Amino acid sequence: MTRPETIIPEKPTSPYPIHTTAPIISGFGRGSSELGIPTANIPINAQLNSLPTGIYYGWCKIHPVSDQNDETRTRPDGQLILFNHGNKLQANELVVHPMVMSIGWNPFYQNKEKAAEIHIMSKFERDFYGAELEFIVLGYVRPELDYTTKEALIEDILTDIRISRDILENKEEYTKYKKELE
């Protein structure tokens, strides 16, 4: 499938902005290991489920859950995952970050469940499974596509990241929403 042209309005238009919070859950383990693009997976709530599948952009902030102890859980592929609930994050990681989010079926991987995966456009020293992720979705980049190669998928994800970062950092009508999470 050919990537459609991305047309971004001058400011968020209905149904955006969408402001919500969700716990970070374990996903399939592909974002970091296979693609080199880590994601924070979240359950799909009714608000997100009402959106068309595709790629979205906005702002997010991680909130540690301090009343939870570390625990190990098993991912569907059998790998053990440490849920530290974000309690190991440093102060400089607990700020507002730009994000790009995929909602859909990931046809390249033939998922049987719809997934919401958020790539936070920052580097982190540790994982933060179990933390709460507060985020604001401000717009839509493109529909979900299928790919014939992993390289084509990665290339499109990197394009989504570049487009989203440019919008969030350079368009005042989008940049101003960062303050809602500070």
UniProtKB/Swiss-Prot annotation:
The active site is at 117 (nucleophile). It catalyses: riboflavin + ATP = FMN + ADP + H(+). Its EC number is 2.7.1.26. GO terms for molecular function: ATP binding; metal ion binding; riboflavin kinase activity. GO terms for cellular component: mitochondrion. InterPro entries: Riboflavin_kinase, Riboflavin_kinase_bac/euk, Riboflavin_kinase_dom_sf. The keyword Transit peptide does not apply. The keyword Transferase applies. Its cofactor is Zn(2+); Mg(2+). Mg(2+) binds at residues 39, 41. GO terms for biological process: FMN biosynthetic process; riboflavin biosynthetic process. Belongs to the flavokinase family. Catalyzes the phosphorylation of riboflavin (vitamin B2) to form flavin mononucleotide (FMN) coenzyme. This is Riboflavin kinase. It comes from Lodderomyces elongisporus (strain ATCC 11503 / CBS 2605 / JCM 1781 / NBRC 1676 / NRRL YB-4239).
